[in-house]
């Protein structure tokens, strides 16, 4: 399991590209430089300890959310194929600083989830994970039954995020929490 206080998943390795060790990745990041700027990246297989790799080159495929990248030491298709399905990580301390009112999705993990009933805020659960395939779904564990529900992270459903006060406010449509 990834320690979200230390690591951020920024991409998924989907396939080799060609015969010279190039790798096709699916981006889970809004920052293209994570795949185009040379430097350290980490690759994680399953829940194993991440392994450091040196990104030497990368470019975005036109009209796609995927990139073609090259890692130092990955020189042929077989080596690239062995990385298929693994996650590309960066260290949280290397994450770009954001403007006031902005936050990284990983900061949402462990926040309390509140709803408003009769003008009172009530804690109904906790954000325990993210399901981020460009859909930005919050995995919330409900207090009443320990059930996990997926909540779309959109302004209409999550209008308030207060990192300092450790909560998000939900305004779920009828039935969303019962799914």
Curated annotation (Swiss-Prot):
One of its GO terms (biological process) is rRNA processing. It is found in: Cytoplasm. It holds the Pfam family PRC_RimM. Residues 100-176 form the PRC barrel domain. Keywords: Chaperone, Cytoplasm, Ribosome biogenesis, rRNA processing. The PRC barrel domain binds ribosomal protein uS19. HAMAP family: Ribosome_mat_RimM. This is Ribosome maturation factor RimM. It comes from Prochlorococcus marinus subsp. pastoris (strain CCMP1986 / NIES-2087 / MED4). The gene is rimM.
